[in-house]
Amino acid sequence: MSDSSHNLLYNKFELPESVKMSPVEGAVGGIDKVARFVADPLEKGMGHTLGSALRRALLIGLEAPAIVSFSMTGVLHEYMAVEGIIEDVTNIVLNLKGSLLKKYPLQDCEGGRCSQKLRATISIDASDLAAAGGQKEVTLGDLLQEGTFEAVNPEHVIFTVTRPMQLEVMLRVAFGRGYSPSERIVLEERGMNEIVLDAAFSPVVLVNYFVEDTRVGQDTDFDRLVLQVETDGRVAPKEAVAFATQILSKHFSVFEKMDEKRIVFEEAISVEKENKDDILHKLVLGINEIELSVRSTNCLSNANIETIGELVIMPEPRLLQFRNFGKKSLCEIKNKLKEMKLELGMDLSQFGVGLDNVKEKMKWYAEKIRSSKNTKG
């Protein structure tokens, strides 16, 4: 770690205090499957930067369990039919691919990421068939008789039985990310007649984002990021965004080590942290009442800025548009305001002050403060 005297001082970045999550109206599955996230304000350009990175991490980086193989009594290969079962094995495989299982491989659980075999015995007698109208559906929930996996869609039909029988079914479940075709899946101790499946591990179905303009104080040149995430239920949208953020942080940490110099960001000034009366007393001060160079004072006077209130409500880019107003004057003014615990581009809306009425409001507040002093005197 470098000496703090070599740290670089950067101007503050506007950041959201928190990310707001809300349900999407009309979405199937509710907030457990579809949610909207809003982050604002962000510096111009950061909305697309964060939105694109999060979208990619959500689509390719998240992990979830999936069935990677199965075996069943009487099934020798994928291209056959089983007597007493309506679906052929090819259709059973397709149904298994649509099975959604939920579980997190915990760090303190030995072998938590290893593939697991889930075994089930399906016994169907004549009374079961009669109660079901002659065709008994076997669902994903029926096959999860052991293990700690939870079925997201337990009513999902795997196959349909038409005569009394007893079947032994084995499902092998593994964790992964993205999509893996069957030829890329390597199984340890693969059993005879064990059929390997294509596996869709990614729990994220769809990610959309867009960026809107938003304001900070009187400055509208900021971004609002709106991110909409849809999952299949194996991971909730809120969890998905949190996991994607951690994945990105892990990768960015590699680049963070490239230079010993560290950036220290200036703190944003919050009006809430200061006593309102103290701030008002500063805002009504005339420009000529603070120690500025003649050049800076003249620049502000030429721009018809008479009070500190008129100055601090002004966004930095707008100040630079005034005639003869350069970087040197800007730096001097920012340093002086920092000494006063003020800054450019402040939001004074809680005082009823905006760019359109700041001059009149400062006069009104100045008169109010003078009247208050005279009354106390």
Swiss-Prot record:
Keywords: DNA-directed RNA polymerase, Nucleotidyltransferase, Transcription, Transferase. GO terms for biological process: DNA-templated transcription. Residues 276-377 are annotated as: Alpha C-terminal domain (alpha-CTD). One of its GO terms (cellular component) is DNA-directed RNA polymerase complex. Its EC number is 2.7.7.6. The keyword Nucleotidyltransferase applies. It comes from the Bacteria. The keyword RNA-binding does not apply. GO terms for molecular function: DNA binding; DNA-directed RNA polymerase activity; protein dimerization activity. DNA-dependent RNA polymerase catalyzes the transcription of DNA into RNA using the four ribonucleoside triphosphates as substrates. Belongs to the RNA polymerase alpha chain family. This is DNA-directed RNA polymerase subunit alpha. It comes from Chlamydia trachomatis serovar D (strain ATCC VR-885 / DSM 19411 / UW-3/Cx). The gene is rpoA.
